[in-house]
């Protein structure tokens, strides 16, 4: 059969992008493939899905748009369920992340639908024991809205700094995790401690992760200063970033701030030790997003 007669090729031809392309899911990098097939049963094969995309050269930026295509009816039904587990993000938490955030992730989630989708995945069912099923369902179902996460800083002296916020219905899931910490299989030197109402810290030998609920918003961070300022807007936030307008109406959005990354002391040091050529190639790029 000629490739030009395939449904994927014909759909690609109808696009009005500067560059149109399509590729079998088996041919794209595993990190992107795993993101697309998240939660789908293991019996769904990569070759059942084709990635159709378009590249547009716009003023000051290069825009990439992609979608999944399949002629397998069973896979179509599963992809539909996958789409139903996410909704358009409201960008609720962008004001809490500084504009200098190195990598920003934002997704709109319907927790109950996501749990139902994952329940059809054999690996997920095998991982979650019957005894823990209700607790896991409670945790997933508590998510209802935006989940935003950001890589804030990277240094040589400590673990990369991150921050995460999520819309939740209540704090029941976190309270359940704390009360059942003995069954979590914590290793020596690890513990979960309660700092106050709906405030906890997961302590390890190398890092502390502060997490909790504030105003029906779940948070988690490994930086004590960020923890103490939870719920406070940044002076100049992601809301003011050049890519902020591109987030509107998206269910999933990922941005990488190349300017901020190149400005890191650790990157400047690496450039001084022979990484200048790579820096020269990256420097013209301000940011990239998916």
Language-model-detected regions and their locations in the chain:
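Leucine-rich, highly hydrophobic segment in Treponema pallidum outer-membrane-associated proteins
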Residues: 7-103, 256-290
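Generic detector of short, locally flexible boundary/turn motifs and exposed helical patches
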Residues: 29-34, 67-72, 125-132, 182-188
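Short, solvent-exposed secondary-structure boundary motifs
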Residues: 36-47, 81-85, 131-145, 181-188, ...
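Single conserved position on a long alpha-helix in the C-terminal lobe of the eukaryotic protein kinase
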Residues: 1-6, 145-243
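Long, low-complexity, Ser/Thr/Gly/Pro-rich intrinsically disordered segments that act as flexible linkers
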Residues: 7-29, 57, 93-96, 100-111, ...
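Intrinsically disordered, low-complexity segments enriched in small/polar residues
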Residues: 37, 51-52, 58-61, 143, ...
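Short amphipathic alpha-helical linker/capping segments at the junctions of internal repeats
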Residues: 2-13, 81-96, 124-126, 185-186, ...
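A short, polar/proline- and glycine-enriched secondary-structure boundary/capping micro-motif
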Residues: 74-79, 116, 175-176, 230-233
């Amino acid at each position: 059969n000629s490739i030009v007669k395939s449904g994927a090729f014909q759909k690609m031809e109808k696009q009005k992008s500067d560059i149109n392309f399509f590729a079998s899911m088996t041919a794209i990098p595993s990190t992107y493939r795993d993101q697309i097939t998240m939660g789908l049963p293991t019996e769904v094969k990569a070759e059942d899905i084709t990635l159709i995309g378009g590249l547009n050269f716009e003023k000051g930026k290069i825009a990439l748009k992609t979608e999944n295509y399949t002629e397998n009816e069973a896979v179509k039904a599963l992809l539909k369920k996958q789409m139903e587990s996410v909704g358009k993000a409201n960008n609720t938490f962008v004001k809490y992340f500084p504009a200098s955030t190195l990598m920003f992730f934002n997704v709109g989630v319907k927790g109950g639908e996501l749990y139902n989708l994952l329940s059809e995945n054999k690996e997920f069912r095998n991982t979650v024991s019957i005894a823990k099923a209700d607790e896991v369902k409670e945790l997933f179902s508590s998510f209802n809205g935006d989940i935003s996460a950001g890589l804030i800083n990277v240094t040589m002296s400590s673990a990369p700094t991150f921050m995460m916020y999520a819309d939740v219905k209540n704090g029941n899931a976190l309270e359940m995790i704390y009360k059942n910490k003995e069954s979590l299989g914590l290793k020596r030197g690890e513990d979960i401690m309660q700092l106050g109402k709906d405030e906890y810290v997961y302590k390890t030998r190398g890092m502390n992760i502060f997490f909790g609920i504030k105003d029906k918003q779940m948070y988690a961070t490994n930086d004590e200063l960020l923890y103490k300022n939870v719920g406070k807007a940044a002076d100049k936030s992601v809301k003011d970033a050049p890519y902020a307008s591109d987030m509107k109406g998206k269910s999933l959005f990922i941005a990488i701030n190349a300017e901020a990354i190149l400005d890191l002391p650790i990157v400047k040091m690496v450039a001084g030790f022979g990484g200048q050529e790579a820096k020269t190639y990256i420097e013209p790029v301000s940011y990239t997003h998916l």
